[in-house]
Structure formats: structure tokens, C-alpha cells
């Protein structure tokens, strides 16, 4: 089966680099599915889970807190603001981040504080959702 080169990088490190049969991720206007030979595309990514279907059936999962997606016919590049490998996701930390963001939202004194708190809350909620999706998938295997 045809594959596509996939790179997922954050400001800190390269998270994934390899060949994949399929990539699914949260685009700005909805979920995107990328197959080998996909038409070129550049778009923003919302916070959420990136699923990389590799040969052999072991999918790779990465949580991204937003970023940019570039697709070329033979390559997919995810430039993430922040990225965490699926195996490194921590539900307790994500829940704590959600609580802090909700508290900050309640106490926001300016539009800037409000916007920052809303962004942090959206990221924490997306991370918790990604953790739940990953747990559901792992329980099936």
C-alpha cells in the first residue's frame, strides 16, 4: 500500500517522523483525513488528537495544541505550537489545567485575560478529549 512521509514537530522537538498510510487531525474547519497523493494544502490546526496510521496496525497518537499543517503529495508536515506523544498524555495534569483555566476565566479582568483563558480552556478540554479517545481505542485492542 502507498505511504506518505509524516513529520510532527513542536518548537521543542521532533515528535514523529516516519511513513504512514493515513493521517487524521483537527483542521480549523473540521476533521481532516490525509492519504498519500493528497492535493497540496496549508491550513491551521485546532487543538486535538493527530492519529497517524502506520503499517503494521499500530497507530501513533499525538496531541497538538494548535499549529499549521502543510500537505504535499508525498509529505505531511505538522508544525505544532505544543505537541505531546499520546503515551505521555497525563489526565491529571490536563484536568488541573482545565480547572486553572476555568478559574482564570472567572477572574478575567480584561479582554486579553479573557481571550487567553478561553484559549487555555479550549486546549485543556481538547487534551482531555484526546486522552478519552486514546483510552477508548486502546481498550479495543
From Swiss-Prot:
One of its GO terms (cellular component) is proton-transporting ATP synthase complex. It comes from the Bacteria. It is a peripheral membrane protein. It holds the Pfam family ATP-synt_DE_N. The keyword Transport applies. Keywords: ATP synthesis, Cell inner membrane, Cell membrane, CF(1), Hydrogen ion transport, Ion transport, Membrane, Transport. It is found in: Cell inner membrane. F-type ATPases have 2 components, CF(1) - the catalytic core - and CF(0) - the membrane proton channel. CF(1) has five subunits: alpha(3), beta(3), gamma(1), delta(1), epsilon(1). CF(0) has three main subunits: a, b and c. One of its GO terms (molecular function) is ATP binding. InterPro entries: ATP_F1_dsu/esu_C_sf (IPR036794), ATP_synth_F1_dsu/esu (IPR001469), ATP_synth_F1_dsu/esu_N (IPR020546), ATP_synth_F1_esu_C (IPR020547), ATPsynth_dsu/esu_N (IPR036771). Produces ATP from ADP in the presence of a proton gradient across the membrane. This is ATP synthase epsilon chain. The keyword Magnesium does not apply. Belongs to the ATPase epsilon chain family.
